[in-house]
Amino acid sequence: MINFAARNRKMDMEKSYKAALFDLDGVVFDTESQYSIFWGSECRRYLPEEDGLEHKIKGQTLVQIYEKHFSGELEKERENITKRLYKFEAQMSFEYVPGFEQFISSLRQQGLKTALVTSSNKMKMEAVYRKHPEFTTFFDAILTSEDFSESKPSPDCYFRAAERLSLDNGDCVVFEDSFNGLRSGRAAGMTVVGLSTTNSKEDIAPLCDIVINDYIGFNI
């Protein structure tokens, strides 16, 4: 179990946890800035009137992005966007957020269960596995967009992760970076640790129990 000392007045003082649930981009890998470049280009091409859309869609599945923003006349462009996205992801740099490998290894040594809960699909994950063959050894469960019907900020993905691990929601702590992801963890009734890899500490603080820059020096 994790036992968090008091780091924020909103947290339970000495609550123990049995599982840690991690988002992928901006939480495990420092990749959100790369996606901002890709989706910024696509949004300016097709939806120039929606300023900053590339930031608002973070945490959403590709299906949800298409349904909400690329429908009607833009539906015919989905195939081309998808092809460009997969080509982009195949060339992406997947660098771990500083301290992540040591942190999650420590959790597992303590007997905690760990799960990846990402809006990315299985094809994206195949690119991750090719670049990081060790990746699957970090997690007891990996949930992708194919495993849940509602995307973040819905709590559905985290409900399913807790169920997969045979744990109660309150036994889990969530690590997230995007506004949609943070809201998802909060709506699931879980303790939420926010990483300021994508948004500022000040902006994400209202949605978190703890805010950290990365995993370096984050002791349990």
What function would you assign to each model-found segment?
Residues 1-3, 94:
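Short intrinsically disordered, low-complexity coil segments enriched in acidic
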Residues 3-18, 105, 121-220:
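Asp-based, Mg2+/Mn2+-dependent phosphohydrolase catalytic module
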Residues 15-110, 126:
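N-terminal helical cap/lid subdomain that shapes the substrate entry/recognition surface
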Residues 27, 118-120:
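Conserved phosphate-coupling serine/threonine residues in phosphotransfer and NTP-handling enzymes
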Residues 90-95, 119, 188-189:
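Short, flexible loop segments at the rims of nucleotide/cofactor-binding pockets, characterized by
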Residues 110-112, 190:
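Short phosphate-binding/catalytic loops that engage adenosine nucleotides
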